[in-house]
Amino acid sequence: CGALPGALFGTAHSLELPEDDLVKAMLSAGLIGVFIAAHATFAAEVGGCMAETGSGGGMAAAAIVEMKGGTLQQSIAASSLALQNSLGIICDPIGNRVEAPCLGRNVMAATNAVSCANMALSDYEQLIPLDEVIETMKAVGDQIHHTLRCTNLGGLSITNAAKKIEAMLEEVPGKFFKSC
């Protein structure tokens, strides 16, 4: 997911942080990722786009708090908030390619991470603890219909415009990126 490195490198650059601070932030993100991997999923084919961009945003939010000198509790709160905002996002790639609306959803996840980090740093209470949000993320992913989990069978994937794009892409094999 591009949300994690995009948000972290952009924030580190903006704050003019040394590389060591970025590495520490990546470790914080990784710890959140361990919790997600252990109790939910990162695969859009299993949990929709919230499993990919949502997880990336949740990990990035915690890392940004670390970069800005926040507390452990604030990092966890930021991750919880970001994941709460991502629940239920489906995976419906246009033209059966992981390009659109994927890029926009990665941008959304990165901006969500920055916003949630700032909320947590302002001591906004996340209300639902991170572990319960991750459990909910798993449950919601299980409830998302299979047509909305990177199958090219639902959502934007089946619009008339998307089908025209898919047909055009199939006319020139090998020219475009691989499909899901």
Question: Where does each model-flagged region fall?
Answer:
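Functionally critical mobile loop/hinge segments
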Residues: 57, 62-180
